[in-house]
């Protein structure tokens, strides 16, 4: 019912509403058996998924998501992030992800805007932003775990690039130093 609210307010046919509800529910991983449950019977993660599905069902050209992975387990978090990427690719929509999770931003963002004290402090591609890890930390923000690990390894004398922000990049850089050429073990 909650997922259908937006499409119904758009005065779509019942068939179109039903199609959009099922498509959006599938997108966020909500099984059909939850469709008729009361919101009081749902977990926090299920409620968050239903809220996201309600927006997706409207097929917006610009999708703004505020902390969409909050309250989700790691598997649910990864699923939502991948679905956001898939949605952007499939629809060509602009997706604005508001998050404090730099790991989430590192995984899916094409552009990152960092705000500090109500002003834009940084604006650029992930590699440009995360190469300024010390500034991010000084602002009280975390950096992706691979960035922290790479920084610690640089402090121990390893010659690693500044712009490491994903596990794949970290793995490839360490293997390249070891003569492995970036191939997986």
Name every feature range the model reports, one short phrase each.
Residues 38-42, 46:
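Conserved ABC ATPase signature
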